[in-house]
């Protein structure tokens, strides 16, 4: 198939210098091209401080002098068409720095990279994939996800499941093989979205994908770019959305990467007080430079347009917003007003979210922001950052700390579990139980829980009940939906054999039932960030460590009452205030034997009585099971 001619025009250079060339990835990088009837590859790279740039690779036996690039204009872009180069060719840019160094750099815009520990870029063609997800894409752009169910399965492909027979030490499934397994699992469990960790190319497995060298390349650990397209396509066909972890906060310092790319700091800030993360040993992007902002904004659009991704979860937003994040005195510089806010990063978020909101309203931007920064999900015109959702890290912290307590002491910290509702309407929240909570000696979710094994799993079930009843979208890291007992490690697969154990199978079945209810009843998602969608029945029964509340929908039909007991005690004839005199039907009892419980029963139907209790005119009474 003959390719059109690729070239970099003066208009391309101008827009890139302005920071508004959102198709720049179609010009910079390596692109199959035809010039004067001759097929080959057009190479383009931004290296404004280089004395010279040459292309080296398998096509010229890595000859360092044979293919010098031409500098195009004053913007620092270099270009060269090389006849005869084909897809699959490995290459690098040889940068001659002004201080005399020779730098062997991978292509920042490459779409495919050599399998690690190799560091070369690979010529590839990402056009021409036969997408079959048009129905999904059309429906996506019409949805208001604030009013839709969102239950996210956070997943690391390399450790989800290991391949027993692929002949490698890592045992990675490729994207296509993984698709066959993950699609079936997510459909069975009723998750709405999957959030994939570590997709952008990165050299070190132990970074989990958070120290990136190839922002425009799906990692070759699991196959080719079109293999990754296949994965997204299959997920969409199954009705599952795809969110990627995206890391604009910092990047890896590996020699072949972006750091000191042309001998000087062009992607990072040259002052280490602004350009380095001492805590992480990484470089910080220079958000005040137009070309850098362009690189990042175009990258988000690249995943959206070329790979049909449905959203990005922006990692470490707090580290971008605060100039002194993770730094000691003397390691940071204040802004022009003398404060610690990173004004350039704030403007970058405005730029990113305004471009996305204005063109692709169905595409989600999700902030992992761990402080109380205001208006993260407010519109940019309302002095907000413009994100679609924010992880509720405060809820996560309070939830985990409370659930770790021995039930005897929970009454003393009762309001930790109610506090998040006091600020729930301030942002569009996602409730995350993510990978960060099951590593570094924090224990898996089930092993955070107190007591003997049966108590631990009962705690987990009632904890998940609280999570799914609480306002906010949901996120569970892989393995936590069946009670993975070991902490997560990127080096090994989940302990799937545990599904043969009664307690693990019980939790797995229970989470499946919660997800089914969550998707069925609009009361559980339609008014998440609105006080009209939530009403406490009794938030104050610290003595019994119980909570009761009602979730509501706009129609007023099928509102749901939650009653939760956070102790191992069975509270007999327990009274719960209710809003109306009506018959209340049991939907789910976490103490059923099929969930691994002790089998304490709750009546299938209970009629409310005219017995005022806790500010309500009506109430119901029943035996409330332990951890039920």
Stretch-by-stretch model annotation:
Residues 1-149, 176-186, 190, 454-457, ...:
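Carbohydrate-interacting/catalytic domains
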Residues 174-178, 224-227, 291-296, 341-348, ...:
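Soluble or luminal CAZymes and related metallo-dependent hydrolases
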Residues 47-49, 73, 84, 156-161, ...:
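Short, flexible loop/turn elements at secondary-structure junctions
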Residues 70, 204-209, 253-260, 377-378, ...:
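Short glycine-biased active-site loop of nucleotidyltransferases that positions the nucleotide triphosphate
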Residues 308-310, 328-490, 498, 519-576, ...:
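Conserved alpha/beta catalytic core and glycan-binding cleft of carbohydrate-active enzymes
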Residues 114, 134-147, 156-341, 622:
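Substrate-binding/active-site clefts of carbohydrate-active enzymes
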Residues 101-103, 161-163, 202-205, 250-254, ...:
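Short catalytic/ligand-binding loop motif for oxyanion handling, primarily in non-cytosolic enzymes
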């Amino acid at each position: 198939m003959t390719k059109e001619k690729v070239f970099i025009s003066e208009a391309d250079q101008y827009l890139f210098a302005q920071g508004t060339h959102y198709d720049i990835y179609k010009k910079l990088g390596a692109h199959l091209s035809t010039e004067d009837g001759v097929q080959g590859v057009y190479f383009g790279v931004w290296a404004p401080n280089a004395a010279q740039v040459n292309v080296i690779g398998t096509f010229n036996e890595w000859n360092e002098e044979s293919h010098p690039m031409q500098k195009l204009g004053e913007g620092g872009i270099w270009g060269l068409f090389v006849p005869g180069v084909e897809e699959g060719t490995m290459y690098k840019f040889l940068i001659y720095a002004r201080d005399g160094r020779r730098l062997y750099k991978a292509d920042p815009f490459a779409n495919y990279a050599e399998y690690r520990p190799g560091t070369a870029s690979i010529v590839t063609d990402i056009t021409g994939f036969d997408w079959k997800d048009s129905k999904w894409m059309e429906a996506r752009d019409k949805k208001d996800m604030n009013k839709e169910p969102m239950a996210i399965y956070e997943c690391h492909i390399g450790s989800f499941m290991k391949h027993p027979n692929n002949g490698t030490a890592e045992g990675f499934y490729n994207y296509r093989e993984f698709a066959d397994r993950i699609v079936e699992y997510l459909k069975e469990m009723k998750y709405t979205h999957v959030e994939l960790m570590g997709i952008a190319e990165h050299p070190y497995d132990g970074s989990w994908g958070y120290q990136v060298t190839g922002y425009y390349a799906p990692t070759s650990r699991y196959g080719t770019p079109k293999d990754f397209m296949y994965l997204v396509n299959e997920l969409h066909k199954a009705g599952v959305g795809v969110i990627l972890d995206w890391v604009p906060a910092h990047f890896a310092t590996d020699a072949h990467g972006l750091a000191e790319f042309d001998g000087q700091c062009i992607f990072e800030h040259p002052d280490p007080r602004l350009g380095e993360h001492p805590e992480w040993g990484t470089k910080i992007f220079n958000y005040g430079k137009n070309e850098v902002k362009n690189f990042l904004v175009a990258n988000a659009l690249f995943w959206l347009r070329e790979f049909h991704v449905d959203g990005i979860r922006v990692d470490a937003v707090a580290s971008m917003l605060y100039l002194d994040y993770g730094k000691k005195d003397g390691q940071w510089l204040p802004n022009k007003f003398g404060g610690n806010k990173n004004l350039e990063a704030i403007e970058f978020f405005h730029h990113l979210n305004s471009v996305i909101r204005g063109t692709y309203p169905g595409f989600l931007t999700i902030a992992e922001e761990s402080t109380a920064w205001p208006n993260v999900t407010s519109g940019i015109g309302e002095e907000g950052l413009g994100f679609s959702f924010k992880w509720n890290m405060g809820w996560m912290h309070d939830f985990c700390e409370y659930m770790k307590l021995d039930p005897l002491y929970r009454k003393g910290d009762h309001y930790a579990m109610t506090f998040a509702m006091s600020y729930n309407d301030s942002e569009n929240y996602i409730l995350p139980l993510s990978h960060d909570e099951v590593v570094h000696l924090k224990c898996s979710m089930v092993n955070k829980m107190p007591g003997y094994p049966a108590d631990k799993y009962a705690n987990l079930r009632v904890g998940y009940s609280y999570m799914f009843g609480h306002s906010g979208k949901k996120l569970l890291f892989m393995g936590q939906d069946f009670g993975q007992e070991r902490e997560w490690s990127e080096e090994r697969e989940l302990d799937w054999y545990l599904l043969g154990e009664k307690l693990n199978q019980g939790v797995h079945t229970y989470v499946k039932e919660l997800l089914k209810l969550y998707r069925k009843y609009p009361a559980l998602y339609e008014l998440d960030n609105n006080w009209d969608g939530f009403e406490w029945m009794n938030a104050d029964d610290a003595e019994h460590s119980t909570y009761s509340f009602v979730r509501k929908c706009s129609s007023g039909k099928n509102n749901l009452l939650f009653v939760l007991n956070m102790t191992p005690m069975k509270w007999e004839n327990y009274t719960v205030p209710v809003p109306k005199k009506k018959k209340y039907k049991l939907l789910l009892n976490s103490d059923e034997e099929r969930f691994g419980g002790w089998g304490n029963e709750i009546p299938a139907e209970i009629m409310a009585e005219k017995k005022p209790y806790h500010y309500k005119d009506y109430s119901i009474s029943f035996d409330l099971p332990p951890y039920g």
